Each structure stands twice: as structure tokens, then as C-alpha cells.
Amino acid sequence: MTLVRLHGILAQEYGDTFTLAITNPKNTLHAIDCNKKGFIRRLIELHKEGLPYDLIINKTRITHEYQIDSLKNPERIDLVPAITGNGPISLGAIFLNIG
């Protein structure tokens, strides 16, 4: 099981802790959206409003999409508000184009 912690506005609106049976971190958003309808839509809205989120897996900030492919069965995933201009990729860039 993977512990998923939301932070910031998402935590206030959807709760801060989820325990999910996921093996691939790329399934995180869809798993939360199945339990909390509108979650992905809200994440997209926040991203468009200039409030992107960063992805931290097992205490490591993900800065490139290829890093996710090597992280199977994560123990903990945190979705945290990104600091604007903080790097080359944000959660939206990683996940929002995955179908």
C-alpha cells in the first residue's frame, strides 16, 4: 500500500491522506479521482491559475518524467504546492497528459 499525502489547497478540499493500492506512481491521480470525483479537474484548474503541484516520491522530488518509471511500489507520495519557477517539470507536466 502507498501512503499519499496532499498538501495546500488540495488537502483542504479533498482531505490530506489516502492509502492506495498502486504499483505505478503514474496511477496516483486517477486512483484519487476515483475516490474523490473532480480531483483531476481541480488539479488542472489550479495549474492553469498558476498554482502547480510538485510530486515527491519516497522523499525525492521528481524533476524529470523518466524518474517515475524506475519507482515501482512507492511507500509514500506527496503532492505539494510548487514554488513558481522551481524547475523544469511540475506534477501537471508529468501527469496531466497521461490517459
Regions found by a protein language model. Name each.
Residues 18-20:
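Generic detection of short hydrophobic beta-strand segments and adjacent strand-loop junctions
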Residues 1-16:
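Eukaryote-biased recognition of intrinsically disordered, low-complexity regulatory segments
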Residues 8-10, 24, 83:
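A broadly conserved detector of short glycine/acidic/proline-rich loop/turn motifs that flank catalytic sites
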Residues 34-58:
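Short loop-to-beta-strand transition segments
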